[in-house]
């Protein structure tokens, strides 16, 4: 039965790093869907434009459900904008959805962001503008990831959750 792992949270909190490490840990055939990559690289949409992104993410999630044992979806994935996507996930992956919210304080998120090679492209003012405090899903339960957890801790916790 197909499973989906959802990694959500504010920009710069470590979701994509954890998603890539988790894909490597789970192994061959693990389908990684990155909201940022789909929006910026595949579709060329700017921040605030999500018309095509939501539709393509829904198609990718369906592909993962039909063809992959495990799919990982990572991104900011704000409630409201992506509610249709989460409704689809709740329906398709009933009982096989593993969702995590990166509940990282802004100061820690900014510190992590500033360590990235592309940190100069997006500054503190923009990060604050994008910030959404505890933007939790309404129809899918999310396990919280706190700032004390490193990437290895996160990966091993999620791996244990999906292999029980």
Show where each model-derived region lies:
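Conserved substrate/cofactor phosphate-moiety recognition/catalytic segment
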Residues: 20-62, 66
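P-loop (Walker A) phosphate-binding loop of NTP-binding proteins
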Residues: 10
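Small-molecule kinase domains that catalyze NTP-dependent phosphoryl transfer to phosphate-bearing small molecules
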Residues: 115-157
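Walker A/P-loop
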Residues: 16
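Conserved phosphate-donor/acceptor-positioning beta-strand/loop module used by diverse small-molecule
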Residues: 93-112
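ATP-binding Walker
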Residues: 13
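Glycine-rich phosphate-binding loop used to anchor ATP phosphates in small-molecule kinases
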Residues: 52-94
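Hydrophobic anchor at the beta1->P-loop junction of P-loop NTPases
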Residues: 7
């Amino acid at each position: 039965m197909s499973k989906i792992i959802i990694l959500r949270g504010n920009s710069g909190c470590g979701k994509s790093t954890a998603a890539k490490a988790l894909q490597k840990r789970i192994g061959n055939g693990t389908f990684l869907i990155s909201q940022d990559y789909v929006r910026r690289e595949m579709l060329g949409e700017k921040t605030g434009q999500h018309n095509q992104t939501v539709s393509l993410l829904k198609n990718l999630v369906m592909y993962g459900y039909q063809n992959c044992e495990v799919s990982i979806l990572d991104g900011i994935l704000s409630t409201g904008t992506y509610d249709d996507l989460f409704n689809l996930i709740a329906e398709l992956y009933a009982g096989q959805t593993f969702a995590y919210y990166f509940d990282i304080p802004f100061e820690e998120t900014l510190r992590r962001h500033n360590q990235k090679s592309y940190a100069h492209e997006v500054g503190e003012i923009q990060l604050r503008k994008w910030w959404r405090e505890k933007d939790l899903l309404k129809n899918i339960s999310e396990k919280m990831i706190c700032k004390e957890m490193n990437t290895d801790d996160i990966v091993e916790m999620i791996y244990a959750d999906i292999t029980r």
